[in-house]
């Protein structure tokens, strides 16, 4: 982390739903939380994008006037890119080793996303 931050930068770590210390179990049958997202016409990854946006809104309210950059590795970086595209308060994104397309098994699962765009398209939308 020290290679992308500067002295005095505030760094916050977000564990969106189903990740980290609040991770839900992966028993058979599939987890009820994951199944309830599907019943609502969403995916868990869609909820994670909204978690990132909500955290960004909170940080803007707490630290008025700061530049907010989000990032992540692999699929989490792609979720950060989608959050940056949807939230004007996010100024930049740092991605580490993102999947090249939503056709990859490791890519975030977002319903019908390939009808509209793919990962390079979203990165192009948020590029300066």
Question: Predicted regions: what is each one?
Answer:
Residues 13-15, 94-95, 128:
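A structural signal for short, well-ordered beta-strand segments and their strand-loop junctions
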Residues 1-62, 102-108:
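Cap/lid segment of the alpha/beta-hydrolase catalytic domain
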Residues 55-125:
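Primarily recognizes the serine-hydrolase "nucleophile elbow" in alpha/beta-hydrolase
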